[in-house]
Amino acid sequence: MYYSIKLRASRDGKHLSGGERIVLKDKIEEAVNQLYRKAEPKDPDEINIKIESIKEKPLVIKSSLKIENIICEDYKSSNQIALEILKRSTGIPVERLKELIDLVHTGSAPDGSNMRGAMIVNQKGERIELDHFRGIRTTTVDFLDRDKILKKLVKKGYTERTVDALCLTTKNMLYPDMIAEYCISDEPDYITGYVSTKDFYYRITPLKSEGNPKGGRIYFVRNSIDLQDFYRFLQEKPVLIEDVGID
């Protein structure tokens, strides 16, 4: 049986770090320690760890999305490339895409803060997430052998952040009515972001300005999407990925 381990670290009620692993019972202690070591340097005053058995049989897929690395001179050039990819994938007019991306860079919650989850945007350019503060979060996904995948990616010059991002966005793109994704971190000093489509994870540097504490995700979906089913799949369906899409 597989177990889901979720960790959330915060300070003064503000979210600092989070992570999830899906492992067999004999790997629980090791996974908890790994998640704790990731959160501890951020000096949280509260850490919550939740461990629960996964009742539903995980969907096992062969590989993650293929990685395409893009490096530009500045974040404006990077976002121009992101716009071109998103326009091709979604059909949404560039001006509306710019407005949506600007929201992520300035705070996409109604009060101008960062959303806790992702925006959901249909092909009409409409925001359709059920809660504009909470958004939607993708959970219950991991690589079958995470340590092996991390070693492969590090050898190619990537980081553990790439493992986490690639894992989440690969699950997202499994959903038939998910078209594309845009993501930047809310950490001020982390400027690499990504755009994903059905085939590729475009890792783009820099996708935001250094020092900007805003960030978030946009999930682009078809107009015909069943929102309740989409939420259930992303938040509850267990997915395990065997390999990573690099040469």
Swiss-Prot record:
- Provide this UniProt record's keywords sorted from A to Z: ATP-binding, Biotin biosynthesis, Ligase, Magnesium, Nucleotide-binding
- Enzyme class of the recorded protein, top EC level: ligase
Q: What InterPro entries does the database record attribute to this sequence?
A: BioW
Q: In which pathway does it act?
A: Metabolic intermediate metabolism; pimeloyl-CoA biosynthesis; pimeloyl-CoA from pimelate: step 1/1
Catalysed reactions, as listed in the record: heptanedioate + ATP + CoA = 6-carboxyhexanoyl-CoA + AMP + diphosphate
* One BP term from GO: biotin biosynthetic process
**Molecular function, one GO term:** 6-carboxyhexanoate-CoA ligase activity
Q: What is its EC number?
A: 6.2.1.14
Cofactor(s) recorded for this entry are:
Mg(2+)
Its annotated function is as follows: Catalyzes the transformation of pimelate into pimeloyl-CoA with concomitant hydrolysis of ATP to AMP.
HAMAP family listed in its UniProt record: BioW
The record's similarity note reads:
Belongs to the BioW family.
| Assembly notes | Homodimer.
By what name is this protein known?
Answer: 6-carboxyhexanoate--CoA ligase
Which organism does this sequence originate in?
Persephonella marina (strain DSM 14350 / EX-H1)
Please name the gene that encodes this protein.
Answer: bioW
